[in-house]
Amino acid sequence: MALNIENIIAEIKEASILELNDLVKAIEEEFGVTAAAPVAVAAAGAADAGAAKDSFDVELTAAGDKKVGVIKVVREITGLGLKEAKELVDGAPGIIKEGVATAEAEEIKAKLEEAGASVTLK
C-alpha cells in the first residue's frame, strides 16, 4: 500500500478519539510542536497590534451645544461644503477623518473639543 494523503486521511477518519489523541501527542513529540501554540500566538499578536497603532480614525461622537462652531471646524478639517459638514455633524456619531497620523489626530481632536464637540480616536 502506497503512502499518500488519501490513505492517511482515510486512516484518520477510521481512528477513535483516543487513537487521534495519541497521534497528536506523538506528532508533538516527534516535531517539537504543540497543538495549542497558534491560539496563544494570535492573542499575543492582537495585543501588539493595539500598542503599535500609528494611525487613527477621528470620530465625532456628539456635536454639543455649539453646533455652528463645530460645523466650522469640520469644514476646515475636511474641506467639505457647508451642507455636507452640517449633515456630518447632525449625523453624529460619525467618522470625520480616517487613517490620520497620531499627531494630526490629536490636533483635530483638540480643535473639535475646543469648539464644544465630543471626539474619540479609534
From Swiss-Prot:
InterPro entries: Ribosomal_bL12, Ribosomal_bL12_C, Ribosomal_bL12_C/ClpS-like, Ribosomal_bL12_oligo, Ribosomal_bL12_oligo_N_sf. One of its GO terms (molecular function) is mRNA binding. Transmembrane segments: none annotated. GO terms for biological process: translation. Pfam families: Ribosomal_L12, Ribosomal_L12_N. One of its GO terms (cellular component) is cytosolic large ribosomal subunit. Keywords: Ribonucleoprotein, Ribosomal protein. Homodimer. Part of the ribosomal stalk of the 50S ribosomal subunit. Forms a multimeric L10(L12)X complex, where L10 forms an elongated spine to which 2 to 4 L12 dimers bind in a sequential fashion. Binds GTP-bound translation factors. Belongs to the bacterial ribosomal protein bL12 family. Forms part of the ribosomal stalk which helps the ribosome interact with GTP-bound translation factors. Is thus essential for accurate translation. This is Large ribosomal subunit protein bL12. It comes from Streptococcus gordonii (strain Challis / ATCC 35105 / BCRC 15272 / CH1 / DL1 / V288). The gene is rplL.
